[in-house]
Design a protein with these regions (language model features):
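Short N-terminal targeting/anchoring amphipathic segment
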Residues: 202-212, 216-237
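Membrane-proximal helix-turn-helix segments that form the acceptor-binding/catalytic region
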Residues: 217-224, 259-279
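A charged, aromatic-enriched C-terminal amphipathic alpha-helix characteristic of glycosyltransferases
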Residues: 487-521
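Catalytic binding pocket for nucleotide-activated donors in carbohydrate/polymer assembly enzymes
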Residues: 430-494, 499
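A short, active-site helix/loop in glycosyltransferases that binds the activated sugar's phosphate group
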Residues: 272-298
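Short acidic alpha-helix that forms the nucleotide-activated donor recognition element
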Residues: 416-427
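Conserved catalytic-core segment of nucleotide-activated headgroup transferases in glycan assembly
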Residues: 284, 309-394
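Active-site donor-binding acidic/aromatic loop of nucleotide-activated sugar
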Residues: 388-393, 405-416
Length: 526
């Protein structure tokens, strides 16, 4: 059995995944090496299981978003709260008890509940539309209780507040009885409900990590077999914790992912590298750096590129138009000259369109780029050269008053990876001319076999293989024509991507992985 112990932790509390409303403006970059590896094992029908250490009341929707809902899961918090064989139900607003004098105010973001003219509660929803949490307020408008809902349709835990500050959190069982209490204002000490003392070794713990360690150890003693292999995505929250908990004779694979483990952090990971048997590295330049930093451990380091198999390969050839996706990055500012080059190419080239894509941009930022694009068109390009054919909006008679003139460019503001996946479905070419190309856009491009044009060399794009590297934005037109004029070059990029994906996601990779593991287990005598 292969066990994956994911590094899905929150930004504020170590053992808690963030519970954030769907409309929060930061781009949710959730994809990581664990999703890539789970899918790899699933496709080859290799027995694997997720061991989730963190508190994740919305775990099922999270796994569903990434296409791994069918994965076998053991959740420590489910065990701690005695949540076994739970019947999933959809929780509606009317399922919750409200006083008869409550008024409900609906907004596009949340439902505010008023009582006697004052805010009494706020009901938040998750990305998928389920009730994710409810905040209750006192007469002074301060938060008094925060109910966190499980995505299976019940209250998972309640945070109680004292003068607007979190005091303690009760973790509930299916009957709504608290099993254990985490004192948030007292260093996180944990108190077990004496009624359930028989399920724990003690009634008081210094912090939640001791409770997790106890149940993790209990699980290993019950389920673990000698030949099991543990895949650990490296994370400062859990590396040492896991190496301390896992028996020394088990095979441990450490996995590095650039969005979680920057190259600057490699020098701090020596203890993890020494205790791991195999280290999987997501980028070739990272592999080289590690071999230079740790020559005595170089045999442990191996390369595995991440791919997101939620994307479908080669869909753009089903469309007459060549759609170009242009990556906006407001943190670097908007390059007017780059916009001009792209718009000029669209204006001069038949059957081409461009999508300007941003991640969780503000309304002001989107208005700014739209205004700049319109300014460039008015001043340097004729609007009529960017017009599509006339659209009569499905009208029976193509009268002049029914006609709508569409333009060959559009703006898309995306909140998460699924939005980008949807946007890229029929895209022929990705253009990212930022100083630091967006990591997930590059991974998505390779995964979908879409060639990319960049100003900066990266490990994900190889010149004339699966992309085009330009030294100046004025070279954009030449690069774009290379991939849009004929299908030959575009097909070559697709074939190159398919070969890369096969190398890192199919039987070819698993044979290599088994070989690396065999080398280790032979040494250990397993």
């Amino acid at each position: 059995m292969y066990y994956f112990i994911p590094a899905w932790y929150g930004s504020n509390r170590q053992w808690h995944a963030d519970v954030t409303p769907w409309y929060y403006s930061s781009f949710r970059f959730e994809f990581d090496d664990t999703f890539n590896q789970i899918r790899l094992f699933q496709r080859q029908e290799i027995a694997s299981r997720l061991l989730v250490l963190s508190y994740q009341p919305h775990l099922r929707y999270f796994l569903h978003r990434h296409g791994v809902l069918e994965t076998e899961v053991y959740s420590i918090f489910d065990d701690l709260q005695d949540l076994h064989d739970i019947h999933t139900q959809v929780l509606n607003l009317r399922d919750i008890e409200w006083d008869s004098d409550c008024q409900f105010l609906y907004s596009p973001f949340a439902i505010v509940v008023q009582k006697n003219g004052k805010k009494y509660a706020k009901v938040e929803h998750g990305v998928e539309g389920f009730i994710s949490d409810i905040q209750y307020f006192d007469n002074n408008g301060q938060i008094s209780k925060h109910y966190i809902m499980d995505d299976r349709g019940f209250v998972s835990s309640v945070i109680y507040f004292d003068d607007g500050q979190p005091a303690y959190q009760d973790y509930l069982d299916p009957k709504g009885i608290w099993r254990f209490r985490e004192h948030l204002n007292e260093g996180g000490r944990v108190e077990v409900n004496p009624i359930f003392g028989y399920r724990f070794k003690q009634l008081h713990y210094a912090d939640i990590s001791q409770l997790i360690a106890e149940y993790f150890d209990k699980y290993l003693k019950r389920k673990q077999e000698k030949q099991d292999i543990f895949i650990i995505p490296s994370h400062p929250h859990h590396d040492q914790f896991l190496f301390d908990c896992l028996p020394s004779d088990t095979t441990k694979i450490l996995s590095l992912f650039i969005n979680r483990n920057s190259q600057a952090s490699f020098k701090d990971l020596a203890p993890s590298f020494e205790q791991a048997d195999v280290v999987l590295v997501d980028r070739e330049d990272s592999l080289q750096l590690l071999q230079d930093l740790y020559p005595e451990l170089s045999d442990k380091f191996h390369h595995l590129s991440p791919f997101d198999t939620r994307l479908r390969l080669g869909r753009s050839q089903t469309r007459k138009e060549s759609i170009i996706y242009y990556q906006l990055d407001f943190s670097e500012g908007i390059d007017r000259q780059a916009l001009f080059q792209v718009l000029s190419f669209i204006a001069e080239t038949k059957n081409t369109e461009v999508i300007f894509g941003a991640f969780s941009a503000s309304q002001e930022q989107m208005e700014e780029v739209e205004s700049l694009v319109n300014e460039i068109i008015q001043g340097q390009i004729h609007t009529d050269s960017l017009e599509k054919g006339l659209d009569y909006g499905g009208a029976e008679n193509p009268l002049e008053e029914n006609q709508e003139q569409e333009l060959r460019f559009q703006f898309v503001n995306m909140n998460d990876e699924l939005d980008l996946i949807k946007t890229l479905e029929f895209v022929r070419l990705i253009v990212d001319l930022n100083k630091q190309p967006h990591l997930y856009t590059q991974i998505a491009g390779i995964s979908a076999g879409i060639p990319q044009i960049n100003l900066v060399e990266t490990v994900y794009v190889e010149h004339l293989k699966n992309g085009y590297l330009i030294s100046d934005v004025t070279e954009f037109s030449k690069a774009a024509h290379y991939y849009t004029d004929k299908l030959k070059e575009w097909n070559q990029a697709l074939v190159y991507s398919i070969d890369k994906i096969k190398e890192h996601t199919g039987q070819r990779f698993l044979d290599k992985l088994h070989h690396w593991i065999e080398e280790v287990t032979d040494v250990k005598g397993l």
